[in-house]
């Protein structure tokens, strides 16, 4: 019970996560990408939780959620292990682990960062062949 309470979030945060999930798009049939357009003090937490939650959907093996924080676009990446999100986000200046990674991109808007992420995902798969 203590663990469940620790992972709980308030209704406002839950609604934000639900909206992010509802806007998710699939690339390569199993990678979810979504955007959190609001800028608030908890953007990075909301994006991380949404990226985690996207992995609970069947057939999604990796997820990336982009959000605004100050003058940066933050990316939270998650994977069930089949796709190395660390390698993908390192190409955008980030880092982490095979199943959990993040990046902060400056000097680009949300659409540019999203396209750059898709380019890096394409590059990742072309290198796997």
What is the role of each PLM region?
Residues 1-129:
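Hydrophobic helix-and-loop "lid/oligomerization" segment in the mid-to-C-terminal part
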């Amino acid at each position: 019970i203590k663990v469940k309470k620790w992972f709980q979030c308030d209704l406002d945060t839950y609604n934000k996560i639900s909206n992010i999930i509802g806007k998710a798009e699939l690339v390569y049939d199993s990678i979810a990408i979504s955007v959190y357009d609001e800028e608030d003090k908890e953007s990075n937490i909301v994006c991380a939780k949404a990226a985690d939650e996207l992995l609970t959907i069947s057939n999604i093996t990796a997820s990336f959620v982009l959000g605004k924080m100050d003058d940066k676009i933050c990316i939270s990446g998650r994977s069930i292990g089949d796709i190395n999100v660390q390698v993908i986000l390192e190409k955008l200046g980030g880092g982490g682990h095979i199943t959990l990674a993040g990046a902060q991109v400056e000097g680009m808007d949300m659409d540019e960062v999203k396209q750059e992420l898709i380019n890096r995902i394409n590059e990742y798969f072309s290198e796997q062949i």
